[in-house]
Amino acid sequence: MGDRMLPAALRLAGGRAPILVPVPLTRARLRERGFNQADLLARALSRRTGWPTDCLLRRERGGPALARLGRRERARVAERAYSVNPDLPRALALHPEVLIVDDVVTTGATGVACAEALGTAGVECLGIVSFARTNPLAEPS
């Protein structure tokens, strides 16, 4: 799986060695599923690149699952769904840039929200890399 994301990750990194930051799940969702698919993808990509992976973001509990929402609602909910992990300064000592890793990009709201949360903490986000991208149906009017 890391092979599929490798070209985009290398292009976005531009010769740097960023921290791979998986999009987090809520604790409830992680317990239900038993794994975080974005974390598995980040680890696979890390094995191919040698870049570190670290869970620098937290998904705040509450709110609906983004996968079930339309474009506008996704953006509204995602805007306040992510926060920075308190371990952030220590993790960034050697690798000041990050790449966000997600399984699927639908509207881009999750990636933007994660990048904004990291940006407010002074982290340079080089981009988001995902395993797949969907082509969402138009929202009903």
Ranges and model annotations:
Residues M1-I100, T107-S141:
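Conserved PRPP/pyrophosphate-binding segment of the phosphoribosyltransferase/PRPP-pathway fold
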